[in-house]
Amino acid sequence: MDSRLLIVLIPVLAAASWAVYNIGRVALQQFRKMTS
């Protein structure tokens, strides 16, 4: 495993997980509004 690859991957994975977290949270709020 190349250390340069990790240096690139870590911020990308962090950004991706942050985006998924935010999208999921908003989607849950929308879903709760629809079901209530």
From Swiss-Prot:
Residues 24-36 are stromal. The gene is psbY. GO terms for biological process: photosynthesis. It comes from Porphyra purpurea. Residues 1-4 are lumenal. It is a single-pass membrane protein. Coiled coil: none annotated. Keywords: Chloroplast, Membrane, Photosynthesis, Photosystem II, Plastid, Thylakoid, Transmembrane, Transmembrane helix. PSII is composed of 1 copy each of membrane proteins PsbA, PsbB, PsbC, PsbD, PsbE, PsbF, PsbH, PsbI, PsbJ, PsbK, PsbL, PsbM, PsbT, PsbX, PsbY, PsbZ, Psb30/Ycf12, at least 3 peripheral proteins of the oxygen-evolving complex and a large number of cofactors. It forms dimeric complexes. GO terms for cellular component: chloroplast thylakoid membrane; photosystem II. InterPro entries: PSII_PsbY. The chain crosses the membrane at residues 5-23. It is found in: Plastid, Chloroplast thylakoid membrane. This is Photosystem II reaction center protein Y. The keyword Kinase does not apply. Belongs to the PsbY family.
